[in-house]
């Protein structure tokens, strides 16, 4: 590379830089904007470097504690940051432990008092004071325990202990009210509320769950111990819908693998009994089975008449009157009766000659046990009284691709599958109805149209939201363009005008040289030369005028 080319490139760069500086120095607006931007960037960088690292001082501060701590921080001239969503108070990292020690000495922030209040034993405290301290300690400990739940921000508990009474009729149970401050956009589900109820009831003696009331910071009752009629009806309706949807899903799950997706539609109606019903039944039936008969009691009586004289043997002398409670006693007694009968017969045979006119009567009374059954039945709430299912099945396609109805045998199979899926019971009076019809084809396109409409509405909403931003950006770009490029356009016009004048002068010089060459050239034909000069003068009279001026200056 030659030194001349290097010098030319350096000179061109110098010219560009000089033009750039001249452009910015001539345009004062650009200088002001650049100066303001430079000041803002330097200030922001310096503040960012000087800003200390912040660390959490306290979490979940109440409004009263937060105001008290912030006032003390302002008096101590310590910077802080307060997060309203999380309730965190941030202070510089190097002053966290110092501030915690300072606030702990001043007993701030205020925390719930627990069993540590009982550590300070005081002389002369009355029994009422001890009871109040115990109640405060129990309330504080329960509040701390409930605050361990992730959803709960803080808790406040009030316990009402009744006065002790000597009479059982006047004895009352304690009651508890709880207010929970939950975190933002979070809530307690039914299982968590039940857990809190059982936790409190098991922590306090003789406290039942019915005597506990839990509300949140918005005054909403969380435990449904005293539901209204409307709420109970809503729960019943919700339970019925859940049961019906469960049976619908069973029908779809068993038929869609056979008939295809979206070829089966089912509706199930469930009649549910929400009444609480209890029944106690006692039955007595005679025991007709001879082998399994159980004797409850038995009585035997024998009358003997000799020589027209009636003699009634006492049960204690000859025929004992016995009540039997078991089969063992019965067998022993029957054996003794057989002996007595044999002795009577022997005596009759021996005395037959002496006592020709004799008579014997024997009465035997037996009481048997009856079959006795006692049953207690409690009907569950929410028992299904009756189910009715309606199923629509689409036509199937044959080998040629045409929609063909299903035959009767397949419909019977589908009906049997539906019955088995819902647990069909003839005793309850359940009913199942299956229809085979062709589905309406435009329903397939309707979801797409709805999707398109939703997409269009979303597009219009986004377009309307971002249109003001686009307009403002375009307006700002227009102002910047007008500010920056107006002066550059003027400079470009001036530069082009200068270049044009220089080109005109060069053209004039070249033409003058050509004329001088024509003038000093030796030609044989002067008429031709004069004719050419006349043509040049007609075309460019300025050149002739400049030549004449040059001649006059040369003469001088």
UniProtKB/Swiss-Prot annotation:
Gene: fliF
GO molecular function, one term: cytoskeletal motor activity
Statement: the UniProt record of this protein carries the keyword Acetylation: no
Domain of life the protein comes from: Bacteria
Primary location group: membrane
TM regions (residue ranges): 28-48, 459-479
Annotated family: Belongs to the FliF family.
Any matching Pfam family: YscJ_FliF_C
Sorted UniProt keywords: Bacterial flagellum, Cell membrane, Membrane, Transmembrane, Transmembrane helix
Protein name per the record: Flagellar M-ring protein
Assembly notes: The basal body constitutes a major portion of the flagellar organelle and consists of four rings (L,P,S, and M) mounted on a central rod. The M ring is integral to the inner membrane of the cell and may be connected to the flagellar rod via the S ring. The S (supramembrane ring) lies just distal to the M ring. The L and P rings lie in the outer membrane and the periplasmic space, respectively.
Membrane topology: Multi-pass membrane protein
Alphabetical GO biological process terms: bacterial-type flagellum-dependent cell motility
Region (Disordered): 298-332
UniProt GO cellular component terms: bacterial-type flagellum basal body, MS ring; plasma membrane
Signal peptide limits: none
Location(s) in or outside the cell: Cell membrane; Bacterial flagellum basal body
């Amino acid at each position: 590379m030659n030194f001349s080319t290097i010098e030319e490139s350096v000179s061109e760069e110098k010219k560009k830089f000089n033009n750039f500086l001249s452009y910015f120095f001539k345009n004062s607006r650009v200088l002001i904007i650049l100066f303001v931007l430079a000041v803002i960037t330097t200030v922001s960088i310096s503040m960012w470097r000087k800003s200390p690292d912040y660390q959490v001082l306290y979490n979940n501060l109440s409004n009263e504690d937060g105001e008290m701590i912030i006032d003390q921080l302002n008096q101590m001239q310590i910077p802080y940051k307060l997060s309203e969503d999380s309730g965190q108070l941030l202070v510089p990292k190097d002053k966290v432990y110092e501030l915690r020690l300072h606030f702990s000495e001043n007993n701030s922030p205020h925390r719930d008092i627990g069993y540590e209040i009982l550590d300070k034993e005081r002389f002369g405290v009355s029994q009422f004071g001890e009871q109040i301290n115990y109640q405060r300690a129990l309330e504080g400990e329960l509040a701390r325990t409930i605050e361990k739940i992730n959803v709960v921000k803080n808790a406040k508990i009030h316990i009402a202990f009744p006065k002790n009474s000597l009479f059982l009729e006047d004895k009352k149970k304690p009651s508890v009210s709880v207010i929970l401050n939950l975190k933002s956009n979070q809530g307690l589900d039914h299982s968590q509320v039940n857990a809190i109820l059982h936790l409190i009831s098991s922590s306090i003696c003789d406290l039942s769950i019915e005597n506990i009331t839990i509300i949140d910071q918005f005054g909403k009752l969380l435990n449904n111990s005293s539901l209204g009629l409307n709420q109970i009806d809503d729960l019943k309706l919700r339970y019925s819908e859940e049961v019906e949807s469960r049976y619908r899903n069973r029908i779809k799950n068993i038929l869609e693998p056979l008939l295809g997706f979206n070829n089966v539609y089912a509706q199930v109606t469930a009649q549910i009994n929400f009444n609480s019903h209890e029944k106690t039944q006692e039955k007595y039936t005679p025991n007709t089975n001879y082998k399994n008969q159980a004797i409850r009691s038995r009585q035997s009586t024998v009358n003997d008449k000799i020589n027209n004289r009636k003699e009634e043997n006492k049960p204690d002398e000859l025929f004992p009157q016995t009540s039997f409670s078991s089969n063992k006693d019965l067998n022993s007694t029957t054996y003794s009766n057989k002996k007595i009968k044999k002795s009577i017969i022997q005596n009759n045979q021996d005395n037959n000659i002496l006592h020709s006119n004799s008579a014997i009567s024997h009465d035997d009374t037996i009481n048997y046990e009856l079959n006795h059954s006692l049953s207690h039945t409690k009907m569950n709430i929410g028992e299904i009284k009756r189910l009715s299912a309606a199923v629509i099945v689409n036509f199937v396609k044959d080998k040629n691709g045409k929609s063909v109805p299903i035959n009767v045998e397949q419909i019977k199979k589908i009906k049997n599958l539906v019955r088995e899926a819902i647990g069909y019971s003839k005793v309850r009076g359940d009913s199942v109805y299956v229809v085979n019809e062709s589905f309406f084809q435009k329903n397939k396109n309707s979801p797409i149209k709805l999707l398109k409409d939703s997409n269009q509405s979303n597009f219009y909403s986004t377009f309307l939201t971002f249109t003001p931003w686009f307009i403002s950006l375009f307006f700002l770009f227009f102002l910047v363009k007008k500010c920056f490029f107006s002066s550059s356009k003027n400079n470009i016009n001036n530069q082009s005008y200068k270049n044009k004048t220089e080109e005109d002068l060069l053209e004039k010089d070249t033409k003058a040289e050509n004329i001088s060459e024509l003038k000093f050239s030796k030609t044989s034909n002067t008429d031709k030369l004069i004719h050419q000069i006349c043509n040049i003068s007609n075309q460019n009279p300025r050149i002739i005028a400049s030549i004449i001026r040059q001649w006059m200056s040369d003469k001088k």
